[in-house]
Amino acid sequence: MIPEWHERGTCRQVDPELWFEAYPSKYDPVFRLCVECPVQVECLRQSFDDAEEFGIWGGMGAHERERLIPKFRKKPYYERDTWITNLAARLRNRDAEVRARKEATYQRQLAANRAWKEEQKSGSA
């Protein structure tokens, strides 16, 4: 049975195969879709409740979930929602940090390229 929240997921608008890459990188664009999704917390919660072994759920790959599921299972039921909500927030922060690092790298490359072009101009004059 598909939960009602699943219909509101961003993942419904893209190829389902993207969520089941064998070795996804945290730099993979699908993680960004997850952390911006309106049902990220519900998705992440279900993946922990069901101990999903495959795929990206709520912005987290299977290998990451695998090591956290035992911690989740040890939590009392009344603490699990808060734990999942905090985990989702950390994933959103991680995504923002990854994007900031990519932007900083891009800006450094642009600056180096400009400096190289200037050097080429002054050297050929």
Residue ranges and their predicted role:
Residues 1-38, 45-53:
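Immediate flanking context of iron-sulfur cluster ligation sites
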Residues 13, 42, 48-51, 77, ...:
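Generic detection of intrinsically disordered/low-complexity segments and helix-coil linkers/edges
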Residues 22-25, 45-83:
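Polybasic, low-complexity binding patches
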Residues 29, 64-67, 105-108:
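Exposed alpha-helical structural elements
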Residues 42, 66-68, 88-90:
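Short C-terminal domain-edge/linker segments immediately following a structured domain
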Residues 73-125:
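Short flanking/linker segments adjacent to small metal-binding domains or redox-active Cys/His motifs
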